[in-house]
């Protein structure tokens, strides 16, 4: 099995890249794909860049060039669900775009034409992620992760997301785009992210301060999952 891993930022992939043996590096369409072995497992690791379009371009390149059997999305997220704090783990059961709206034509909020209302994560990968999180002693929540091309820092924007998606667990900027590409290519996926901020008025400062913690926690989760894939 070849395992695809997607992260947006250098900080979100460098721990994994530094663990990789027999590494080859491919630069394509503004993205970087590292291929090699991590703890004996065949891995293709993508640094996509930030945002939905970058994530979609990178994930498409990853699937076309490296042809992984599954995709794991790693990185950081803003916690929305009650009880989440910096370093906690969120696992997707489904993803949606919080900034897509074609409801005038009868679609659900966040749904794009020719797409499902949400992109459902692979049940086996979701269960494995929860198992690994519990084994590593993390506080973990599974649920809906919402994506959009905005860094959410509280205020009206966060309030609107909560109103549109009452069961939202976390927000970030790539997961739904990655999920949509995996849906089209019929590749199983799951999103596993560590909380870097609370999506509130202090989110910008919190993100800068706690991104290294989130990157370490999410990378540890991926390493734990690799051991069992």
From Swiss-Prot:
The protein's enzyme class: hydrolase
Pathways involved: Amino-acid biosynthesis; L-methionine biosynthesis via salvage pathway; S-methyl-5-thio-alpha-D-ribose 1-phosphate from S-methyl-5'-thioadenosine (hydrolase route): step 1/2
Reactions it catalyzes: S-adenosyl-L-homocysteine + H2O = S-(5-deoxy-D-ribos-5-yl)-L-homocysteine + adenine; S-methyl-5'-thioadenosine + H2O = 5-(methylsulfanyl)-D-ribose + adenine; 5'-deoxyadenosine + H2O = 5-deoxy-D-ribose + adenine
Entries under Gene3D superfamilies matching the protein: Nucleoside phosphorylase domain
Signal peptide as annotated in the record: none
EC annotation from Swiss-Prot or TrEMBL: 3.2.2.9
Keyword Hydrolase: yes
Record-listed substrate binding positions: 78, 152, 173-174
Catalytic machinery residues: 12, 197
A family per Pfam: PNP_UDP_1
GO molecular-function terms, A-Z: adenosylhomocysteine nucleosidase activity; methylthioadenosine nucleosidase activity
InterPro entries for this protein: MTA_SAH_Nsdase, Nucleoside_phosphorylase_d, Nucleoside_phosphorylase_sf
Entry's Gene Ontology cellular component terms: cytosol
Keywords associated with the record: Amino-acid biosynthesis, Hydrolase, Methionine biosynthesis
Coiled-coil segments: none
Top-rank lineage group of the source organism: Bacteria
A GO biological process held by the record: L-methionine salvage from S-adenosylmethionine
Similarity-based family: Belongs to the PNP/UDP phosphorylase family. MtnN subfamily.
Biological function: Catalyzes the irreversible cleavage of the glycosidic bond in both 5'-methylthioadenosine (MTA) and S-adenosylhomocysteine (SAH/AdoHcy) to adenine and the corresponding thioribose, 5'-methylthioribose and S-ribosylhomocysteine, respectively. Also cleaves 5'-deoxyadenosine, a toxic by-product of radical S-adenosylmethionine (SAM) enzymes, into 5-deoxyribose and adenine.
UniProt-recorded name of the protein: 5'-methylthioadenosine/S-adenosylhomocysteine nucleosidase
Organism: Mannheimia succiniciproducens (strain KCTC 0769BP / MBEL55E)
Gene name as annotated: mtnN
């Amino acid at each position: 099995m070849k395992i695809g891993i997607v992260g947006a930022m250098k900080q979100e992939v460098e721990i994994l890249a530094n663990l990789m043996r027999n590494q080859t590096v491919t630069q394509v369409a503004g993205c970087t794909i590292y291929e090699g072995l991590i703890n004996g497992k065949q891995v293709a690791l993508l640094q996509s860049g930030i945002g939905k379009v970058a994530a979609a371009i990178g994930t498409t390149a990853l699937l076309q060039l490296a042809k992984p059997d599954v995709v794991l999305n790693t990185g950081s997220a803003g916690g929305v669900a009650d009880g989440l704090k910096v370093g906690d783990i969120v696992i997707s059961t489904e993803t949606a775009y919080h900034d897509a709206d074609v409801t005038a034509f009868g679609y659900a909020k966040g749904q794009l034409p020719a797409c499902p209302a949400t992109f459902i994560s692979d049940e086996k990968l979701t269960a494995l992620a929860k198992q690994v999180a519990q084994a590593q002693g993390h506080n973990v929540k599974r649920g809906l992760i919402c994506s959009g091309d905005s860094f959410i820092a509280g205020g009206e924007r966060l309030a609107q997301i909560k109103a549109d998606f009452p069961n939202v667990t976390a927000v970030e900027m790539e997961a739904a785009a990655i999920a949509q590409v995996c849906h089209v290519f019929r590749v199983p996926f799951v999103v596993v992210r560590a909380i870097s901020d609370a999506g509130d008025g202090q989110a910008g400062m919190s993100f800068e301060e706690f991104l290294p913690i989130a990157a370490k926690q999410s990378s540890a989760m991926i390493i734990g999952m690799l051991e069992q894939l």
